[in-house]
Amino acid sequence: MLQAITLMFSLFLSICILAFSNGAAGTLLALKITEAGFSSLSVGLISSGYFFGMIVGPFYVQRLVTHIGYIRAFSAFGSTLSAALLLHPFFIDPWFWTFLRIIEGVCMVGMYICTESWINEKSTNEIRGRVFSLYALLVMAMVSLGQLILNVPD
């Protein structure tokens, strides 16, 4: 198992960094929405945009991964997610933020699909469950830590 995890270390590290930043960004964005004085409807639309992207994303992600492969798809989703997260402060508009959150949801589900497919392909039947358990533990821990980092004083 250690050998399999060593082979996938960079993949685990990448998804952990992105899960951490996504956890922090989701919580921070909710605070910024309230601070910006958006209506309750806008808050709901922006917040649900991410999950809408996660629902519709797999239908598009599969074709992209099939055409360009795991590594390129993971890189494309990670880059697009990073760009979308960085665009929020430049345009304070609820419709634009909803659009960005949909893009972020599609990108995160794309990276999850790439990661899980990669783990499934590279792990043997004997250790696959343990590797997936470690992956799930790391992702959930990093999302939680990302949310907790907002409590750290400036």
Regions found by a protein language model. Give the residues of each.
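Helix-loop boundary and gating motifs at the non-cytosolic
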Residues: 2-51
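Short hydrophobic/alpha-helical segments at membrane-entry points of transmembrane helices
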Residues: 11, 95-101
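Loop-to-transmembrane helix entry/capping segments in MFS-fold secondary transporters
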Residues: 40-41, 125-135
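Residue-level signature of mid-helix packing/kink "hotspots" within the transmembrane helices
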Residues: 51-59, 143-144
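Helix-to-loop junctions at the C-terminal end of transmembrane segments
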Residues: 57-69, 150, 154
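Helix-breaking motifs and short loop linkers at transmembrane-helix boundaries and internal kinks
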Residues: 69, 90-92
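Structural signature of the two symmetry-related core transmembrane helices
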Residues: 72-86
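Intracellular juxtamembrane helix-capping segments at the cytosolic ends
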Residues: 110-123
